[in-house]
Amino acid sequence: MDAKVREVAKGFEYEAKSFKAYDMNGYRFHTDKHTRERPNRRSINSAVYCLGTDGRHYYGTIEEIYELQYCGLQGVKPIVFRCSWLNPETVRRIPSIGFVKVERASKYAGNDVYIMAQQATQVFFLPYACTSTEYIDLLKWDVVYEVSPRARLSPPKEEDYEPHINCNALDAAISPTCRSTT
């Protein structure tokens, strides 16, 4: 049996480190309390997204960040986030335009509030900017914006590539094996 698996099977110590902020997956995550208490804050880094094992989309805020310390010499120290989740039944997705909105007042009643830090994607909740009484129903909804990881470029999508390259335009010395597609 792998030594790290054996160490995890023994269980974790009864002490864990707690953090106000933690860097993971190219994001800087903060607890919601830390975000609210910072004077002159310029960013809100406590909102997260996670795809559940049930296939539902979970959005919420980080309440606590813990580093669990397992017994043994292997140094297994997983980071977990305790989150306050929004009710996944109220999430509205329009994949064709990449639009997601959530009802912030609708809280998830389940007990599974922990996720591994590696599972988290940072998001930002943007309230609708409308104040007109005509659109009063929109005021309870927030639009979800998925934050790009720092110092990482998003990988190109299939539609970013040209489907065919006209090799006649290429220098034969650079690509001698290329044949014309026309």
Where are the model-predicted features located?
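Terminal interaction-prone segments of large eukaryotic proteins
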Residues: M1-T182
